[in-house]
Regions:
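Membrane-proximal intracellular helices of multi-pass ion channels
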Residues: 1-533
Length: 533
């Protein structure tokens, strides 16, 4: 039985709506490639600049043509918006890979060698992107703020691409569709709501969705700017000999990747590249700001009351988790590194507090909880207990709902926990007792409470299901030398530059770029920084 003409017409109409909106998004993405183009020109990286110019032009041209051809399509309904969100990320990542591929092929060997720090014995990581799959991986990882990277040696890609990697994470953190709603067009009310919700957002800061999108981006830009200023000043005070130019460049890039909780870095060994305990401490606030819900920032600004941060239950729970988690992870690491106990509990606590175990436990647990993923330790060298502690004690839950973090989110975990305690307490209540559920500053009737608990539980179950499936996939493809802990660590949905694979695999792929398999070079990008130089 052949499909009806009306069915074909509906499919064509729906396709035109999707193509138009994805095309508009690509016009924006192409225009944003002008920013790393300017950075490349500033640092006289001419071939990188040319790659961004070509890529931006192609992306904007294709997007513009698609938009013009389908400009008369109807406004998107919810099912259109879901398709736009799904395909929009895929198409954007594909076009976002173009600069990597083009630069890898057009940049002369002598120029690539100039990107490699003096005295280093490795090649520029731009060569990795001669494989289009590697370039797509890098782009997708950036836009989704996953943070896994094929830039094995980050400084060797040049300033233009260091900026580009940070920029795509920053854009992906707040959401490309939210950005397009704020800048490109103002669809009708229901259409705007559909597009906005298609990225999984529910917070509404202003009466209109476009107003909400703009408010989100104003807050996002403002907080990022403040974090950049803070990092620049703090770095200058801690490392006055680091250089003003590099201080500012690192500060802006780390502000973008910190606020997006994506975890890309300008340094080869992430934050450990500074080799400074003080710089570890400096970067902790930059991670925490990204894990706080944007509506809380909006409330604090609109009410001009910083106490809004303390009133938010997610913030309170998050800092409570920091305290408990840092103590727990430090205890695991103290046993691993062998801090001796001599019978004096006070003295032992003092030695632990000044040990490498506390330094790593403090930074890495907060990095895991906020899902930023910056590293100051070679996590692949940790014992399995410490690795499992940060996976199940921090990464799975993540930071606040309404922030850029990954994980189940504190709010959902809080609702599920309160729901369990509520259900248990109801067993002991009299038959006609009022059993409303209070969560934060809101009180829910029984039906509302059940809906909230069901929604949070469903999302948590779906998240854990994806984790389990990913775990089995990794167990099937990982080489035999990797443990179950490695697989669990890598399979949990990422939001940061977390990796636990061994240096030997990194060396193998780096030394044989032209002969190693795509899959093994792919795993090379998922490594933690080498444990020894």
């Amino acid at each position: 039985m052949s499909p009806s003409p009306s069915g074909r017409l509906n499919f064509v109409t729906a396709s035109k709506t999707v193509i138009r909106d994805i095309g508009a998004l690509q016009v924006l993405i192409g225009g944003l490639m002008l920013i790393p183009l300017l950075v490349s020109l500033l640092y006289q990286e001419w071939y990188s600049g040319l790659a961004f110019l070509i890529s931006g032009g192609v992306t904007a041209l294709v997007g513009g043509v698609a938009y013009k051809l389908c400009i008369d399509a109807p406004e998107p309904k919810r099912y259109h918006a879901m398709i736009v969100a799904a395909l929009g990320w895929l198409v954007t990542a594909a076009f976002g890979a173009l600069p990597f591929i083009i630069a890898a092929y057009i940049t002369p060997t002598a120029v690539l060698e100039s990107f490699v720090p003096a005295g280093a014995s490795y090649q520029s990581s731009l060569l990795n992107f001669q494989n289009p799959i590697h370039a797509l991986f890098e782009s997708m990882s950036g836009y989704t703020t996953t943070g896994l990277t094929m830039s094995v040696r980050e400084p060797s890609v040049g300033h233009g691409f260091l900026w580009y990697r940070s920029q795509i994470q920053w854009i992906g953190g707040a959401g490309m569709i939210v950005l397009s709603l704020a800048i490109l067009r103002q669809p009708l009310g229901a259409a705007g709501v559909s597009l906005y919700q298609s990225e999984g957002r529910s917070e509404k800061l202003r009466p209109s969705i476009v107003g909400t999108a703009r408010a989100i981006w104003k807050i996002y830009v403002g907080v990022t700017a403040l974090v950049a200023i803070y990092l620049a000043i703090a770095t200058f005070l801690v490392l006055p000999g680091y250089g003003i130019e590099q201080t500012i460049f690192d500060a802006v890039n780390h502000a973008m990747t910190g606020q997006s909780t994506g975890g890309f870095s300008t340094l080869d060994n992430s934050i450990a590249g500074y080799n400074s305990y003080a710089m570890d401490i400096v970067h902790i606030p930059a991670m925490i700001t990204g894990a706080i819900s944007i509506p809380v920032y909006y409330a604090a600004v609109s009410e001009r009351d910083l106490r809004e941060f303390a009133r938010d239950p997610q913030v309170r729970v998050m800092f409570g988790l920091f305290i408990v988690g840092v103590i727990g992870l430090t205890a695991f690491l103290a046993r691993w590194v062998g801090v001796p106990y001599n019978g004096d509990p006070i003295g032992y606590v003092g030695r632990v507090a000044t040990s490498q175990a506390f330094r790593e436990g403090l930074f890495q647990f907060i990095s895991a909880q906020t899902t930023t993923g910056w590293q100051t330790s070679a996590i692949g060298d940790w014992n399995n207990g410490a690795v499992m502690f940060i996976v199940f004690g921090a990464m799975l839950l993540g930071g606040s709902a309404g922030a850029t973090v990954g994980g189940i989110k504190i709010l959902r975990g809080y609702i599920v926990a309160r729901g369990i305690s509520w259900e248990v307490s109801r067993v002991f209540l009299p038959e006609h007792a009022v059993d409303d559920l209070r969560i934060g500053r809101r009180t829910f009737k029984t039906d509302e409470a059940n809906d909230e608990i069901r929604a949070a539980g469903t999302m948590a179950a779906a998240y854990l299901s994806v984790l389990v499936v990913s775990l089995f996939v990794l167990l099937a493809v990982l080489p035999s030398e990797f443990t179950l802990a490695d697989a669990i660590f890598e399979s949990r949905p990422h939001k940061g530059l977390w990796a636990s694979l061994r240096e030997s695999l990194a060396r193998e792929c780096q030394s044989s770029l032209n002969s190693c398999s795509s899959s093994r070079c792919g795993w090379d990008g998922l490594r933690s920084f080498p444990s020894s130089s």
